[in-house]
């Protein structure tokens, strides 16, 4: 059966899909995401549709094998402007993770409230894993000090793919560079792909980091603890 209402709804907002519907949704969202990489809604749909049944389950199992990962899955925290208490983060010392994070989102004009909810993942726990991955994304940027321009987003997608193995990261990492000009593509291959691969392989599984518990810690100590290096400088306006 190919109709969504023929399948059970497993959590609020869940949209169940048949295998055929999932296949078309992956193809359509991948095409739209590559044509318009700023369409966060399409990237979110692609992540939902392509992550199951294998990739999200494997990522969840890795979280279950880790003490902090198990705690995150049990408590299922959400990252919002309210839960992170952004006004408080702006009062923290300059080199704390929380201050680095809030300064980064202010500079890049983004908000933790903009992440689309998971809809197309059937298992509720796996749906939370996808949501957690999505909501942690800005912390990867902030700790790495990568802007939200095309090169910065692609570098983080490479990092996410190598570290967590989700297909949405692989598709963005492999095909996204086609949108770079010759100078950008050369710089990206020489500098940011090696950085992403090196750090993706050696870093802690990034969804196993309880970012909310690290906000008042020195960001350099956090980087050392999770084994994630700051990226080579890339200006938001780099041509």
Swiss-Prot record:
Its EC number is 4.1.1.130. Its cofactor is Zn(2+). It comes from Schizosaccharomyces japonicus (strain yFS275 / FY16936). It comes from the Eukaryota. Zn(2+) binds at residues 137-138, 141, 153. Signal peptide: none annotated. The gene is coq4. Pathway: Cofactor biosynthesis; ubiquinone biosynthesis. Component of a multi-subunit COQ enzyme complex, composed of at least coq3, coq4, coq5, coq6, coq7 and coq9. It is found in: Mitochondrion inner membrane. It catalyses: 4-hydroxy-3-methoxy-5-(all-trans-decaprenyl)benzoate + H(+) = 2-methoxy-6-(all-trans-decaprenyl)phenol + CO2. It is a peripheral membrane protein. Belongs to the COQ4 family. This is Ubiquinone biosynthesis protein coq4, mitochondrial. HAMAP family: Coq4. PANTHER family: UBIQUINONE BIOSYNTHESIS PROTEIN, UBIQUINONE BIOSYNTHESIS PROTEIN COQ4 HOMOLOG, MITOCHONDRIAL. Lyase that catalyzes the C1-decarboxylation of 4-hydroxy-3-methoxy-5-(all-trans-decaprenyl)benzoic acid into 2-methoxy-6-(all-trans-decaprenyl)phenol during ubiquinone biosynthesis. It is an enzyme of class 4 (lyase). Keywords: Lyase, Membrane, Metal-binding, Mitochondrion, Mitochondrion inner membrane, Ubiquinone biosynthesis, Zinc.
């Amino acid at each position: 059966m190919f109709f969504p209402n023929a399948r059970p709804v497993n959590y609020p907002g869940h949209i169940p899909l048949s295998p055929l519907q999932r296949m078309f949704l992956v193809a359509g969202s991948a095409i739209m995401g590559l044509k318009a990489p700023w369409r966060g809604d399409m990237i979110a749909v692609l992540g939902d549709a392509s992550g199951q049944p294998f990739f999200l389950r494997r990522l969840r199992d890795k979280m279950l094998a880790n003490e902090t990962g198990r705690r995150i899955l049990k408590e299922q925290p959400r990252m919002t402007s309210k839960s992170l208490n952004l006004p408080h983060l702006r009062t923290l010392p300059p080199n704390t993770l929380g201050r680095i994070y809030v300064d980064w989102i202010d500079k890049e004009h983004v908000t933790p409230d903009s992440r689309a909810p998971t809809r197309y993942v059937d298992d509720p726990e796996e749906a939370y894993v996808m949501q957690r991955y999505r909501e942690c994304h800005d912390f990867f940027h902030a700790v790495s000090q990568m802007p939200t321009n095309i090169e910065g987003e692609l570098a983080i997608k490479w990092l996410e793919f190598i570290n967590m193995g989700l297909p949405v990261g692989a598709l963005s990492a492999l095909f996204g560079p086609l949108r770079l000009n010759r100078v950008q593509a050369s710089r990206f291959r020489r500098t940011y792909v090696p950085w992403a691969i090196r750090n993706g392989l050696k870093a802690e599984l990034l969804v196993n980091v309880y970012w909310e518990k690290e906000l008042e810690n020195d960001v350099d100590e956090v980087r050392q603890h999770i084994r994630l290096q700051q990226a080579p400088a890339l200006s938001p306006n780099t041509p």
